[in-house]
Swiss-Prot record:
Domain of life: Eukaryota
InterPro entries with a match to the protein in the record: Antimicrobial_3 (IPR012522)
Alphabetical GO biological process terms: defense response to bacterium; symbiont-mediated hemolysis of host erythrocyte
Coiled coil: none
MF-aspect GO terms: toxin activity
Major subcellular site: secreted
Protein name: M-oxotoxin-Ot2b
Pfam hit, one: Antimicrobial_3
Tissue: Expressed by the venom gland.
Keyword set, alphabetical order: Antibiotic, Antimicrobial, Cytolysis, Hemolysis, Secreted, Toxin
Any one Gene Ontology cellular component term annotated for this protein: extracellular region
Species this chain originates from: Oxyopes takobius (Lynx spider)
Key word Secreted present: yes
Amino acid sequence: GKFSGFAKILKSIAKFFKGVGKVRKQFKEASDLDKNQ
């Protein structure tokens, strides 16, 4: 019912933030590499 829809939204938000975290980490590592070169 209502609650499962809410849980789905929470799950997709969590997934989104995980993806953003991964991208930010990769971006930071890439910029660190640029500094080192």
